[in-house]
Curated annotation (Swiss-Prot):
Biased composition (Polar residues): 1-17
Bridged cysteine pairs (disulfide): 160-179, 189-205, 228-287
Species annotation: Xenopus laevis
Segments passing through the bilayer: 70-90
Name of the gene encoding the protein in the UniProt record: atp1b4
Residues the record marks as carrying a glycan: 188, 264
Compartment(s) where it occurs, according to its Swiss-Prot or TrEMBL record: Membrane
Protein name, as recorded: Protein ATP1B4
Homology family: Belongs to the X(+)/potassium ATPases subunit beta family.
Cytoplasmic side: 1-69
Amino acid sequence: MATTAGEQANYLQSADSMSDGRQHHPEEAGEKKQEEQKKSWGEWLQDLKIFIWNPEKKEVLGRDKKSWALILLFYFILYCFLAGLFALCIYGLLATISPYVPTYRDRVFPPGLTIRPQFNALYFSFNPSDRSTWSSHAESLNTFLEDYNDEIQQEKNLECTPGKYFFQPGEDHEERKACQFRRSLLKNCSGIEDPTFGFAQGKPCILLKMNRIVGYQAGSGIPIYVTCEILKADASYLGPVNFYPSDKFDLMYYPYYGKLTHVNYTSPLIAMQFTEVKNNQDINIQCKINGKDIISDHDKDRFLGRVAFTLHIG
């Protein structure tokens, strides 16, 4: 029994000491924390300097030269591999794509229409007696038609046979010839005899152009023609429309072989001159192309095969 009592006493004493030890640990942690908080800015700065460059261990940012050499070598190899993989993918992609002919053309829509001059929100308003309201449009048309000057066309392009396609077989990379479209063909809307393009007389000219599509055979053998109509108003407000050189896009300007090979190609134009538009009225006009395989009533694309604009002559 005595021995047992002694063992119990020793056990209680050791338990007390362990309890005292556990009670002292939080105090020691708190003291360490206070010591860290008591560090001055100078000490923090010194620690930072040591971290950046440790002269004793010869370390930069915690790494010696061997460690830095290994990690830089690793990233060099990694990025070289990624760059090579990227270059291989680009090469494979470019090897399957021709720069001359689009790869997929089975879902290409018929061409859209654009007009010149370009004006904001397709609302064209001017006063014939006020030059400032239309001079910029006349200048825009003159600049646009510079490539169509007769001298340039006769020097660079061929005089082709009207009414038939101008096929030019050969390799995709071979340069193709282009047919002449001389500026003088636009007559009253050429800007040659009348540099105001009819604006000064209240008889404005507007140019119509089809978008280019590589390989497209316009009209499937029958020339595409243009019609214009007034929307939501009396047809007499629009009056007659004169078309130059005609209301048709001649087949000899098709097919188009692409920008890289058809270098001197100039898109055929149709000039529309509105000679008897009712003044001081907003005239909503829609012009569209008509022909085989032409879509001009697409609900989601108002420029597919047609173009609508508002004309107001003050």
